[in-house]
Amino acid sequence: MDYSYDEDLDELCPVCGDKVSGYHYGLLTCESCKGFFKRTVQNNKHYTCTESQSCKIDKTQRKRCPFCRFQKCLTVGMRLEAVRADRMRGGRNKFGPMYKRDRALKQQKKAQIRANGFKLETGPPMGVAPPPPPPPDYMLPPGLHAPEPKGLAAGPPTGPLGDFGAPTLPMAVPSAHGPLAGYLYPAFPGRAIKSEYPEPYASPPQPGPPYGYPEPFSGGPGVPELIVQLLQLEPDEDQVRARIVGCLQEPAKGRPDQPAPFSLLCRMADQTFISIVDWARRCMVFKELEVADQMTLLQNCWSELLVFDHIYRQIQHGKEGSILLVTGQEVELTTVAAQAGSLLHGLVLRAQELVLQLHALQLDRQEFVCLKFLILFSLDVKFLNNHSLVKDAQEKANAALLDYTLCHYPHCGDKFQQLLLCLVEVRALSMQAKEYLYHKHLGNEMPRNNLLIEMLQAKQT
């Protein structure tokens, strides 16, 4: 069933930017994307992308790549379960309460606009990239800086990186009995990681000290309870950094040599992912799921969570001429350009563009934790045993984010939609990053026993 909407809000389709015609399969979309989504689901069509699975989808180009168009339909929230399998006209009338809530919030937004006496300014069409930001002013001197993080028991390497990310201290891959095993095995007992070390797992690994968590966030006016809970789950950044640095500094068995720069970056990403797994295990709803569903969700979104973690770190870093590593070290973009390959350099620059875009949107910590939760509970995941629980979590997070943005940013009427559009770019970036990692893997350039490659292979099987 299609639901009407308020035309004076002049909504734009979140998939292609065309004018919406009503509520279709979970949200407001245009007639074209409504029909495309319905045909794809009912006919069980499978598309392929001839490019890099990150094609631009707008009103003029929406028919060029059905694969990317369908992926964007799922990303912005169109619901597979809302399409009738019997091919009869009309959708499943199970989203009526959500539509009514959405209409009520839009009425509230209109009232705020009228009360404040300003005209609703619509942003760029959804699915159409905003104007490119001005070129960053890379005025910092070349090289790398390692600012001393506060409160670290074992700070990051203080010497310069001689070769794009390689510290002067002997950093090595953590022991097979270190946090890698300790954080994954308790949650996923069936997971087997092939070790490059001769010593087998004779006994369950002992986890290291847990990540520290900050004082509970008490919230404030206009902060939904879900966001308050998510803020309380956020780990202390200094504690996470200290743990990762400590793991990287553990001596490797039989490997006293200094690791290569790219290998070191992969190990940083491994340890960052372990901290993300620890966060997910503490999340409401996620900890209620069966282990199989937990693994399915993480296999679907691990790269997006890593990319979004990097993006938010750069927003906090606030320097256009350098990037901040999870260890607290700064790497000049000029160093990346000079020493990284063209593929990695392109990825970094594309990520920096998203950093500028989210900075312009004034992304705050409350929105960050809610978006991270939305990434974890993606609705396009198949073969879940408890799909209804995941769907409920997604709907509550969407509602919380919408409430928060309307309350705290009433002058930015479309901020909620713009934030969701940024998640589309996060996904595109993560897919490009996975392709890069797999390319390095095929060239035997990835370090052995790498968790990221195992996640890639688990997704493909």
UniProtKB/Swiss-Prot annotation:
| Crosslinked residue numbers (Glycyl lysine isopeptide (Lys-Gly) (interchain with G-Cter in SUMO)) | K119, K194
Q: Where are the zinc fingers (NR C4-type)?
A: 13-33, 49-73
Alphabetically ordered keywords of this record: Acetylation, Activator, DNA-binding, Isopeptide bond, Lipid-binding, Metal-binding, Nucleus, Phosphoprotein, Receptor, Transcription, Transcription regulation, Ubl conjugation, Zinc, Zinc-finger
Q: Does the keyword Signal apply?
A: no
Which sequence ranges are marked TM in the entry?
none
Post-translational modification comment from the UniProt entry: Acetylation stimulates the transcriptional activity.
In this chain, where does the modification Phosphoserine occur? S203
Q: Which residues bind DNA?
A: 10-85
GO biological process terms, semicolon-separated: adrenal gland development; female gonad development; hormone metabolic process; hormone-mediated signaling pathway; Leydig cell differentiation; luteinization; maintenance of protein location in nucleus; male gonad development
Sites where N6-acetyllysine occurs are at K34, K38, K72
The record's subcellular location field reads:
Nucleus
Residues that coordinate or bind a 1,2-diacyl-sn-glycero-3-phosphocholine: G341, Y436, K440
Keyword Acetylation present in the record's keywords: the answer is yes
Report the residue ranges that make up the NR LBD domain in this protein: 222-459
Q: Its Gene Ontology molecular function terms?
A: chromatin binding; DNA binding; enzyme binding; nuclear receptor activity; phospholipid binding; RNA polymerase II cis-regulatory region sequence-specific DNA binding; transcription coregulator binding; zinc ion binding
Location of the region described as Important for dimerization in the Swiss-Prot/TrEMBL record = 230-461
The UniProt regions of compositional bias labelled Pro residues, in chain numbering, are 127-139
Q: Where is this region: Disordered?
A: 119-150
Which family does the record claim for this protein? Belongs to the nuclear hormone receptor family. NR5 subfamily.
Q: Which PANTHER family match?
A: NUCLEAR RECEPTOR SUBFAMILY 5 GROUP A (PTHR24086), STEROIDOGENIC FACTOR 1 (PTHR24086:SF24)
Q: What is this protein called?
A: Steroidogenic factor 1
Organism lineage reads as: Eukaryota, Metazoa, Chordata, Craniata, Vertebrata
